[in-house]
Amino acid sequence: MKKTLLLGVSLLCSVFIMATEVPFQKAEIKSIMRKVADWQIANPHPAPEHDDLNWPQGALYVGMVDWAELAEKEDNDDTYYKWLTRIGRRNCWQPDKRFYHADDIAVSQSFLDLYRKYKDEAMIIPTLARTEWIVNHPSEGSFELVEGDLKTLERWTWCDALFMAPPVYAKLYMLT
C-alpha cells in the first residue's frame, strides 16, 4: 500500500513539475542554430585530411543547406547560401578525388541543392560527369571490406556510405 501511495504521489509531482517547464521557443531554437552554424563557419576542421571536399564537410554542408534555406526564408539572410556557394566555386563544384568512394561524393549533395536553387549548370556538371563515368566504368572491387585495401571501399560496404552517395544519385535523378 505504501509503495502504491508513494508511486502515485511521485507521478502526481512529476506531472506538476512537467507542467511548469517552459518549452523551447522557436526564436530560442533558431538563435542556437545560428550560433552553431556561425561557429562551424568560423572554426573549420583543421586537419588537412578533412579539406572542403572530404566527407565530414559533406555531412556539415547537408545540414548547412537546410539552415541556409530556413535563414533565408524566415530572416531574409543569405549568408549561409553565400558561404556554401563560395566553397563550391573554390573547388569548381568537383566532388573529392576517389571516383568510387562514397565519402568522396557526399559534398555533391549540397552542390545539387544549390543547383536546384540557383539553376547554375556549373554546379551540377562535375557531379553529372562523375556519375556518367561511374555508370560506364563499373567498379570491379570486392564486396569484402578489407582494412587497408582501398579497392574494397569502392562497393560501399560500410553503413554510412548509404548517407554519402545514394542521396546524390537520387537528387541527380530528380534534377535531370
Positions of predicted regions on the chain:
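Well-ordered alpha-helical segments within folded domains of soluble proteins
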Residues: 53-69, 100-116, 157-174
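Asp-box/WD-like beta-propeller blade repeats and closely related beta-sheet repeat scaffolds
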Residues: 124-163
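Bacterial Sec-dependent N-terminal signal peptides
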Residues: 1-21
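Acidic/His metal-coordination segments adjacent to aromatic residues that form catalytic metal sites
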Residues: 41-42, 85-93, 141-152
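Alpha-helical junction/boundary sensor with strong preference for TPR arrays
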Residues: 44-47, 95, 118, 138, ...
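Low-complexity, Ser/Thr/Pro/Gly-enriched N-terminal "stalk/linker" regions
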Residues: 20-86, 121-133, 142
